[in-house]
Structure formats: structure tokens, C-alpha cells
Amino acid sequence: MATLDRRALLAVAPALLLAACEPKMPQTASTTPKIDLEGLDTAIKALAVVAQPGFLGVGLMNLESGESYLFNGERRFPMQSVFKLPLAAAVLGEIDAGKILSSERVFLIEQQLAPQHSPIAAAWPGRREYSVGELLEAVVVDSDNTAADVLMKRIGGPGALTAWLTAKYLTGIRVDRYERELQPQIHGMASFRPGWRDPAAYAAAREKVPAATRAAAMTAYMADPRDTASPRGMLEFLQKLDRRDLLSVTSTRLLLEMMGRTTRGAARLQAGLPSDARLAHRPGAADFAQGRSPAHNDVGIFTLANRRAYAIAVFLSGATLDDAGPDAIIARVARAAVRAIG
């Protein structure tokens, strides 16, 4: 693993010591205009009302100056597939350290398959062998759950990933479970079994769980501190990624390039940005169930046409809006951010 850079930590820390919804002075001199923090706060608070009884969390940071905005910045939100971003970073960190080769071959057995979304599970047993590089691409670009679980195991499991984050002074993110554990638990289901790799079979098994059991499991999931991140924690991660504090230049470039190629979550942050903006992101969401959207998120780095770059993190948990509603709120957060940037 890469060694810790305490000087970088001391330089970054002041930019992250801010209260939710409070203005903050830029960390360094900047040629970019200040964020309209008051206007942004007004817009985000209005969207938080729309999201009720769900909770909205927002983080925005000017990556040149460090000027930041947070709403519910310390609140823990379930990540869903957003966790695949720090997972990919940790895998690339192992590649940088020479502990894993991107060309290393992995042969999948049935017990490694994970619930949807997983084109790799759907392709099994027709295809069983992948390189680490191919699995990494499947995780970041296509959000493949089987690929995520296999790579998680390869680096030592969820505990090892959280330890890697902690070693980088990133304590606002924690990963605790494999997808094959987490996803069934959300719905009060038994442990995942290979026969559920078919989406229809998985949905049928989920519907067999009593409604009261599913509702209780969903409520417990939204209150569970495991597998969560705070908006502040995610901004810290994105800032360190942008500053090359986590990975080599080559690995950082590769990760951002893969994040830029995902087509998932296109109705969220991407929908709220100008057409000429570039976005490298990792969305994540749980299925709308029991009348609630337990997790609907999108985090990333966007670069405007004038080359100003910003980190943004939007989390939404517990909204009772229909399937399109949470997407629309995240897109509106992105629009509000662009207006505030000026």
C-alpha cells in the first residue's frame, strides 16, 4: 500500500473542517469565483423538503480552492454501489504497490456469483475466467456486483478495504459486507444462493418474504451505520483522488476515465450539468420497495467548459417518491450547484 503523506494531510485538513451549510474561506488563493453558498443553501433546503420523509445529503467542493458546502454533511447514508469507487481505488492501490497484477486471471465458481446487477453472473457458466483488469472495468463502468465481491475478496475483504481508507485518513466511509450478503439482507431474505442469480428468480424469492419482515429489514438498513458514507467523507475521498494522494498518476487517470465512461445513473448528476461539462462519477441505488427508496446516490468530479473542477456528492435515503423522483432531485441538486458556481 502507498505510504501516508502527513504533510498532504495537514494541507487538506483545514479545507474539510466546516460545519454543514456554513460558508468557508478558500484554502488557497484561487482564480475561480467563490461559490454562492447562501443561494445554494436556499436551493438545497427547498429540495430537502421535497425529499421528505427522506433525508438529503449534499457536498460540493471547488477542487482548486477547497471552498466547500455541506448539507447534512456528517450524516451517514447507505452507499449502495457508490462503495465500488473506494473499492476500485483500493484495488488500484494494490496494483500500484505490485501486490496484484492487472493481468492476473480469476476463475469464477458458482459460489462467487452475486445478485443483480451482475452481467458476469448472467454470463456464467458460459464464461468463467476474467482478468483483474476486466473485473475492475466491470465494477466501475457497469457496477457489476459479482466483480465487486471477487475483487473485495482479493484485497482481503470489507475489513481490509475500510482499513485502507482509514490509513488514508478517510474515516467518513466504511465498507462492511459483500454484495451477496448486503443485498438480500435489505429485503429480509436468507443468504444469497446461486439459483437467485437470475433476476426473475431473485425477485420471486424476495416477494415470498412477508411484507412486515421486508418493511422491518428496510427500516433497519436505513438506520444501519454499516456500508455508509457521509457527504463530508465522500468529498474528502474525491479531493484526495483528484490530488493524486491515493494512487499513482496512471492509476488515478485510469479510475477517472472509467468513471467517465459509465452510462449508469445518467438521469442524476449528468442530467443537471451543462451539456459541455465532463463528469466522472459512481452512482448507486437500491430498488424502490415497500413504498420507499432506501438509497439513491451519485458522487463524482465534474469539469466545466472553463476547466474549473468540482467534487460533488449527493445522497438520498428514505424518500417515498416514485422511481423517477429521486433521480430528479439529484439532477436538481446538480443544477443548483452549477448556478451557485456562477
Describe the role of every protein-language-model region.
Residues A2-L10, E22-I44, P158, T219, ...:
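Structured C-terminal helix/loop/strand segments within mature extracytoplasmic catalytic/sensor domains
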Residues A11-A15:
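Sec-dependent N-terminal signal peptides
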Residues P26-M189:
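Active-site-adjacent loops and short helices of periplasmic peptidoglycan-processing enzymes
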Residues P119, A167-K168, E179-R180, R193-P194, ...:
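Short alpha-helix boundary/capping motifs
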